[in-house]
């Protein structure tokens, strides 16, 4: 039985381009973000992947990425389930602030701890640990059962919600989290064993400019 799980972070958003903390704010994709999503779909189709169901967050940048990936694959008709639990980490009072301005105000070390630490909350926001506390139950209760039943599953979400998932799938420690990068529009392809552990992982790098 095939147990396929593919994770993809949304393409570049307007606030990614402007170097702003985004969190639960809802900017759309940039032109490059659209191209990244389409490239991900082309690459997945080229390599012979298909999906039976897709999950995404309540935010437009992830939803559009999901739709564009599936459109490129000719799979726009499959069910797309929106889960608020897959939303990006809530950056609280940092949301909408320029990251360089935040570093100037609070210092590099503090901003790095807020962005990359596991259990450090920005003012009024969530830590990665908090984010994992809503993402992982959603994965276990809603996504994983479909994978284990043999459905091929796509998850289009966000840097931090996917970091929480990858931490578990890859067996990473809290100390390894600061170095974990989830790139925009790059599919992470997992095949799972019968006991839900990871059998294999493939990173599908894409040529964003091809086919534009």
Swiss-Prot record:
Its EC number is 5.4.2.11. NCBIfam families: pgm_1 (TIGR01258), PRK01295.1 (NF002339). CDD domains: HP_PGM_like. This is 2,3-bisphosphoglycerate-dependent phosphoglycerate mutase. The active site is at 10 (tele-phosphohistidine intermediate), 88 (proton donor/acceptor). Pathway: Carbohydrate degradation; glycolysis; pyruvate from D-glyceraldehyde 3-phosphate: step 3/5. Belongs to the phosphoglycerate mutase family. BPG-dependent PGAM subfamily. One of its GO terms (molecular function) is phosphoglycerate mutase activity. It comes from the Bacteria. It catalyses: (2R)-2-phosphoglycerate = (2R)-3-phosphoglycerate. SUPFAM superfamilies: Phosphoglycerate mutase-like. The keyword Transcription regulation does not apply. Keywords: Gluconeogenesis, Glycolysis, Isomerase. SMART domains: PGAM. PANTHER family: PHOSPHOGLYCERATE MUTASE. Transmembrane segments: none annotated. The record marks 158 as: Transition state stabilizer. Pfam families: His_Phos_1 (PF00300). Homodimer. Disulfide bonds: none annotated. Substrate binds at residues 9-16, 22-23, 61, 88-91, 99, 115-116, 159-160. The lineage of its organism: Bacteria, Pseudomonadati, Pseudomonadota, Alphaproteobacteria, Hyphomicrobiales.
